[in-house]
Amino acid sequence: MRQPNRKRKLSLESTERMNQDRCTGQTEEEKKPGEVTTPSKRESSVTTAETWSWEQYLREGNAVAAPVELFSKDQSFPEHENGFQVGMRLEGIDARRPSVFCVLSVAEVCGYRLRLHFDGYLSCYDFWTNAGSPDIHPVGWCQKTKHELHIPRDYRKDKFVWMDYLKACRLQNAPKKLFRNRSSNGPVPREFQVGMKLEAVDRRNPCLMCVATIADIVEDRVRVHFDSLDDSFDYWCDVNSPYIQPVGWCQENGRTLVAPQGYPHPDKFSWTDYLRASQSKAVPAKAFGMRTPHGFLPNMKLEAVDKRNPQLIRVATIADVDDYRVKIHFDGWDHKYDYWVDADSQDIHPIGWCDVTGHPLEVPYGSKHVKILPGQPACPTPGCRGIGHIRGPRYAGHHSAFGCPYSDVNLKREAALQDRLREQTQANLELDPSHSKSENPCNLNVNGKCENANSQCRLVQQAKCLKIKGKEDIDLDNLFRVLVFHPRRLEYSAAQVQQMLHQPLSMTSTSAHPFRDIPLSREQHCKLLPGVADIQASQVARWTVDEVAEFVQSLLGCEEHAKCFKKEQIDGKAFLLLTQADIVKVMRIKLGPALKIYNSILMFRNSQDVTEDASSQEDKR
């Protein structure tokens, strides 16, 4: 595909025309769970009274576009058109689990981008990527390269054969020629070998430099795994990445190296002792390359994927830069939506990329050229036109702040991608990042694996402070005193019941199992909310929208509010993630019923811990 003439007029009008031919996908606000999109023409997201063009926009704002030369081959204009079609099967990396290769299908095609669907799973786990992504491979790649293929749910691993699967389901595999538009820095140096140790930046917590292992090597990239953590923290990078450094780099540069969980005396970590104990070798320092700093400058214009709504690409400005990253600001939007991204990310492109590839471009908010299409769902968030949903691709649109990816109630929530392999629903609580979740650190395995399933704790200190949704610290001791239950008092007036239900149920404590210290508090709430007893979070997570509404209707005094949950299409997983603010401020339910519903949610969230704790105590006896 050719690069556009710099004098050519780049307009939304041509984008819409190309979009009519190349974009396929559903237009309904709600998509059916697990449904794969069939080809259909997708309406442009905007209409224009006049033609919007980059040329005019740059001239009027006296702005400058980021030069095409600053973009890598993966970011710049593709050499070939996107030949993928809806329904084609392929293999690829799970965006949430970088170690897992899965059976994928093309659910939607838009310009040079794909929405990929995990066969056998709900569409809420779908994710977007470019057609030239190094994370996708043709059918049979895993078998050829000896990688394990994570097969569709309900299929037996020893019985799954690609050709039989395609034939039985009358499916088509994506031709190998479609996987050709890739850049490569050449093969990984032979000095890099699987199992070797190094020091690496934790991409989720960039201030941390941690002990890590080379877990896999594919073509020109390596997979970095953090010793003692699960593979959801892994990431792929090339050997020139600034995120990986040789053993001893932290000591030489005065940086703190985070030892693996469970390592004795982490403040006295010794690479010599650790390598000997793990019977491993360090990656030779000479094998590491040095990436040249990018040439991006503040105020340069470009086109960027909206990470809160990944189906959209917006007109953007570089707000700030550091050595290897740029800060993206969407023109016309509040700076609270700005975010940092690697300078070589496939989510940023030169101006005109959308026009050339046939992808819709979201023009700046407040532009006089933008008009809302008739019938488009209304959203109260300024700038949002009802496109996308905080719960990901399962819903094509929203009409309230509850589902809006940009609303204040969702601003601190991670949008779009959900981990389909993590069965246990995570409680909507955040520990202070300077503390761990548990008083018992993960048991260290010298091969870099974590023997404790709860491996998200990053430091070894005991949790003493709890933060809920980024708000003020809670005095746990005072909270527990409020929750003490007097067993002799077996009868309560209606007012007393309401008063007790208005008291929040503690989610955690300084111990790993909170209810060990306050067993009567749970007993109290079970008596006041009998419908909650013996129901675990894993069961609630499987509830449908109707089942959630039915449960809310069963709560005394909450009958009339069941329709709110049905209207917002809240299923079991979404129900478990609700906060008190969501129920009161977004769904506009009065405080009394809201607290009763929220306490039920807290009971559900903690039921699993209580059951496991009881089983553990029984085993010890």
Curated annotation (Swiss-Prot):
Q: Where is the signal peptide?
A: none
Zinc finger CCHHC-type: from-to: 370-414
Q: Which domain of life is it from?
A: Eukaryota
Q: What residues bind Zn(2+), as annotated?
A: C379, C384, H398, C404
Domain SAM intervals: 543-607
One GO cellular component this record assigns the protein to is:
nucleus
- SMART domains linked to this entry: MBT, SAM
Q: Where are the MBT repeats?
A: 52-152, 160-260, 269-364
Q: Which keywords fit this entry according to its UniProt record? A: Chromatin regulator, Metal-binding, Nucleus, Repeat, Transcription, Transcription regulation, Zinc, Zinc-finger
Q: Where is the composition biased (Basic and acidic residues)?
A: 10-20, 28-44
Q: Could you tell me one molecular function GO term of this UniProt entry?
A: zinc ion binding
What is the stated purpose of this protein?
Putative Polycomb group (PcG) protein. PcG proteins maintain the transcriptionally repressive state of genes, probably via a modification of chromatin, rendering it heritably changed in its expressibility.
Q: What is this protein called?
A: Lethal(3)malignant brain tumor-like protein 4
Protein source organism: Mus musculus
| Originating gene | L3mbtl4
